[in-house]
């Protein structure tokens, strides 16, 4: 009895609804194509974040008319990412539709905005909508939520997606108005469930003439469909293509956990970057610092979290930044006692130009996360701090204009692209794996290698980045941004920024510098950088190879003071000094004795007072140096000879009147020999040099950092000329013995 009694109560409003729908002749009264100005986009945004601005920019690109509801209001619709909710959107739409309910020729497109971009224009949307021959079309989804128990109530779909997605729908204004008039719930109730229950009710579905966009012709929900969609470049345009249905959806929705994929698509759509024209948004909303009277104040955060090679050069490069020093303040965290001397030298130099310098040393015993929180807060708490520029010690900023370039891009968070030399290792990730770690995006290699140049919205960046001070005092006003669960500090920062809806960008519009490797950095030597030829070859070359080395091949500066004795620059002053220091620090000079356990047979016929490279662990480095820098010179001066770049004897010789002042005539046990002067005649010693007896030719003024190269056995009998006072050092290798 109860059931039979309930039927009339349910049927009466449904009959009224059907009668109302029959009275509307929207489809018949709108012959031909609907004009673009008859489409109104409605969205809800109680705040304006980066996602909202991206949505509005894409709408502006296609000349959509957009009405934003809820601006300035408190959001009471729940946490849509982690729970049901969203009812506030329905209420706001219900209120707004009272104004449009009678406009039978008006089409309403309701969509999310924080995680949506348009890929096509109003004409395309309306054309596709009209072809459905329905009054309301909802986005379709392959996933059923929030109530999986309703699956059986959905109409069967043979091709396409079966379930409703409330993130986007389009329909004639009277039908949309009547649909949302059904809402009588609370703001924190679920909008998805509300629309679902309307759709799965056969009578209501018929009354409202609702269908789903089963093949994603208009709406593309990315959640559950990431393997269906690809980026498509064609005819100067960038589109998202659904490869399952061969469609080009117009509104792309990064619902659920797919916001990172949407950010990737948003780097290209709508025509943000194309193969023909490159980056279309790079110069939009930028700042021209040349027109600014007072330069923005920048807090430069420097972080030395592990023993780092080439640190003095890193610090000195910070002082070469093309930015007014009076607008800089420094925050330095140094975790390593090993680097305290480098910091002191740097601060003594920097304090003359930079008035505010805060140093947090190893005695504070701060974790990396605590130190980074402190550095960021140093800017956050200073109302005059316009930007926070964080730089790790493993970043080599070779472009002095880096800071200016980043400021002028005018993004909340932006990082310059830096990579390891010759590798794909960089300071950003283009995608994330399901567990939140590195995954390679389709465009990662092209961005790293500079095949695609622009400003890229990415899920992770580290090592060096710029954050606007006003962002730290608004969206990111919490102090503890570098601690989250068990994540590394850099991952915690990026996770927090993503959750706050703050976009992070990477720029590869310029060459900014590179990353160095801190792996395998052994600090047991006196001058540890000398061992970095394998890990950081570019930095090693810059520090230790003579600046004129390249002129050997471009300007033919090789000299020939004696027949087949070639003379050329090879080492920098620093290389010479550090090699001598390293040998003296080791201190176990051989004394120039004939009996020598270091060599095969234990006897040296022409002994020198020396230390072998092998004794200080430098042998492999030295042999690599020979192959990389000596071998090319060999090919130039000894045409047709290809060296193996191998030497059994590599050593530094020490000449002094007190120990060994000269060396008697001899042939070297080599195909050819190199002899590099490590200090200056006239300054460090008097006398010395080398005489080639067969040619009666002497070289008495060796140049520091320059090498002799001459044949070894048979032709070039030679002797070491006496040192009169001081100490002379040379580095020698018997190559291809």
UniProtKB/Swiss-Prot annotation:
The modification Phosphothreonine is found at residue 320. Glycans are attached at residues 63, 209, 365, 522, 696, 725. The keyword Endoplasmic reticulum applies. Its EC number is 1.14.11.4. The modification N6-succinyllysine is found at residue 704. The active site is at residue 728. Fe cation binds at residues 666, 668, 718. Pfam families: 2OG-FeII_Oxy, GT_PLOD. Its cofactor is Fe(2+); L-ascorbate. The modification Phosphotyrosine is found at residue 323. It is a peripheral membrane protein. Homodimer. This is Procollagen-lysine,2-oxoglutarate 5-dioxygenase 2. It comes from Mus musculus (Mouse). The lineage of its organism: Eukaryota, Metazoa, Chordata, Craniata, Vertebrata.
């Amino acid at each position: 009895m109860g059931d039979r009694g309930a039927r009339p109560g349910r049927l009466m409003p449904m009959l009224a609804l059907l009668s109302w729908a029959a009275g509307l002749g929207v489809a018949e009264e709108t012959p031909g194509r609907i004009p673009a100005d008859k489409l109104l986009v409605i969205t809800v945004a109680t705040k304006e974040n980066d996602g909202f601005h991206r949505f509005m920019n894409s709408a502006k690109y296609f000349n959509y008319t957009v009405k934003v509801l809820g601006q300035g209001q408190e959001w009471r619709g729940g946490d849509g990412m982690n729970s049901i909710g969203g009812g506030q959107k329905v209420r706001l739409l219900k209120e707004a539709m009272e104004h449009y309910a009678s406009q039978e020729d008006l089409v309403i497109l309701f969509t999310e905005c924080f995680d949506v971009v348009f890929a096509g224009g109003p004409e395309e949307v309306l054309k596709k909508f009209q072809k459905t021959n329905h009054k309301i079309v909802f986005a379709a989804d392959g996933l059923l939520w929030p109530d999986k128990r309703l699956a059986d109530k959905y109409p069967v779909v043979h091709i396409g997606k079966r379930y409703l997605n409330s993130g986007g729908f389009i329909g004639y204004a009277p039908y949309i108005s009547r649909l949302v008039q059904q809402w009588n719930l609370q703001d924190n109730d679920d909008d998805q469930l509300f629309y679902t229950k309307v759709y799965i009710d056969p009578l209501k579905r018929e009354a409202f003439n609702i269908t789903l966009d089963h093949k994603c012709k208009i709406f593309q929900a990315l959640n559950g469909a990431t393997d269906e969609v690809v980026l498509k470049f064609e005819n100067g345009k960038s589109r998202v293509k659904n490869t399952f249905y061969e469609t080009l959806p117009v509104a792309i929705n990064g619902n659920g956990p797919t916001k990172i994929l949407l950010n990737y698509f948003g780097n290209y759509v709508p025509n943000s970057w194309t193969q023909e024209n490159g980056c279309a948004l790079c110069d939009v909303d930028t700042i021209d610092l040349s027109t600014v009277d007072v330069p923005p104040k920048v807090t430069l955060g420097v972080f030395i979290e592990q023993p780092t090679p080439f640190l003095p050069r890193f610090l000195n490069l910070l002082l070469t930044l093309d930015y007014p020093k009076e607008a800089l303040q420094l925050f330095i965290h140094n975790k390593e006692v090993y680097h305290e001397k480098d910091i002191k030298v740097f601060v003594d130099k920097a304090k003359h130009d930079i008035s505010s310098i805060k140093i947090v040393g190893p005695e504070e015993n701060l974790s990396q996360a605590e130190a980074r929180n402190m550095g960021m807060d140093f800017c956050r708490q200073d109302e005059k701090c316009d930007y926070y520029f964080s730089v790790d010690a493993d970043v080599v900023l070779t472009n002095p204009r880096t800071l200016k370039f980043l400021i002028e891009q005018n993004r909340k968070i932006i990082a310059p692209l830096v990579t390891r030399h010759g590798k794909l290792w960089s300071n950003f990730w283009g995608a994330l794996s399901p567990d939140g770690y590195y995954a390679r995006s389709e465009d990662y290699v092209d961005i790293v290698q500079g095949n695609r140049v622009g400003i890229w919205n990415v899920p992770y960046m580290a090592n060096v980045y710029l954050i606007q001070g006003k962002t730290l005092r608004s969206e990111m006003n919490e102090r503890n941004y570098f601690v989250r669960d068990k994540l590394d500090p850099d991952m915690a920062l990026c996770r927090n920024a993503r959750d706050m809806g703050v976009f992070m960008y990477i720029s590869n519009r310029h060459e900014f510098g590179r990353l160095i490797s801190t792996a395998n950095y052994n600090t047991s030597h006196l001058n540890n950088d000398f061992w970095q030829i394998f890990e950081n070859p570019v930095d090693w070359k810059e520090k230790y190879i003579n600046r004129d080395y390249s002129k050997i091949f471009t300007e033919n500066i090789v000299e020939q003071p004696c027949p087949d004795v070639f003379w050329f620059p090879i080492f920098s002053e620093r290389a010479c000094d550090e090699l001598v220091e390293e040998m003296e620090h080791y201190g176990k000079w051989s004394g120039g004795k004939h009996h020598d356990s270091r060599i095969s047979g234990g006897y040296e016929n022409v002994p020198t007072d020396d230390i072998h490279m092998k004794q200080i662990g430098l042998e492999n480095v030295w042999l690599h140096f020979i192959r990389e820098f000596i071998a090319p010179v060999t090919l130039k001066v000894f045409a047709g000879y290809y060296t193996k770049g191998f030497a059994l004897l590599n050593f530094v010789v020490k000449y002094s009147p007190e120990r060994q002042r000269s060396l008697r005539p001899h042939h070297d046990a080599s195909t050819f020999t190199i002899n590099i002067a490590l200090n200056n005649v006239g300054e460090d010693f008097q006398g010395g040099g080398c005489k080639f007896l067969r040619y009666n030719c002497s070289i008495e003024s060796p140049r520091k950092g320059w090498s002799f190269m001459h044949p070894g056995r048979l032709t070039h009998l030679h002797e070491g000329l006496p040192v009169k006072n001081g100490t002379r050092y040379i580095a020698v290798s018997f190559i291809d013995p």
